């Protein structure tokens, strides 16, 4: 199984721990970064993980930022992604079994590394349990997806990053 993983600079260490755990379990990890603590932007990495999952490059995705809120919102903008922000086993299993989630999101400063690893392992092994009700619900979710043609452009964030480098944006 191939698992895409991405994070922002705040949780690089946590992502690396999760990545090493997954590799130790025999999973192929596709790490989209970030790889250090240099200030960066979670939408970039959420988008990369989402695209890897929806293209078939990865089977599942894991996104981590400080609270999980930002990167999870970003990855959910990729058409075909159903990501759940979780911090407990029950929510993760519901997301996979009932909503057929293909990405799982965490707040790396909210949920500890060991718990994230346990939850991810359970998420991987859980199976979607299709029912007429949840199939209809998933279809409704897919119906509200926004298809922004520009987001498939490999340079989608280039202008933003150039402005950032010039100091035109700040937190």
Swiss-Prot record:
Enzyme class: isomerase
Catalytic activity line of the entry: aldehydo-D-galactose 6-phosphate = keto-D-tagatose 6-phosphate
UniProt keyword annotations, A-Z: Isomerase, Lactose metabolism
One example GO MF annotation: ribose-5-phosphate isomerase activity
Source species, domain of life: Bacteria
GO BP, sorted A to Z: D-allose catabolic process; galactose catabolic process; lactose catabolic process via tagatose-6-phosphate; pentose-phosphate shunt, non-oxidative branch
Subunit architecture: Heteromultimeric protein consisting of LacA and LacB.
UniProt pathway: Carbohydrate metabolism; D-galactose 6-phosphate degradation; D-tagatose 6-phosphate from D-galactose 6-phosphate: step 1/1
Protein family per UniProt: Belongs to the LacAB/RpiB family.
Protein's recorded name: Galactose-6-phosphate isomerase subunit LacB
PANTHER family: DNA DAMAGE-REPAIR_TOLERATION PROTEIN DRT102, RIBOSE-5-PHOSPHATE ISOMERASE B
EC annotation from Swiss-Prot or TrEMBL: 5.3.1.26
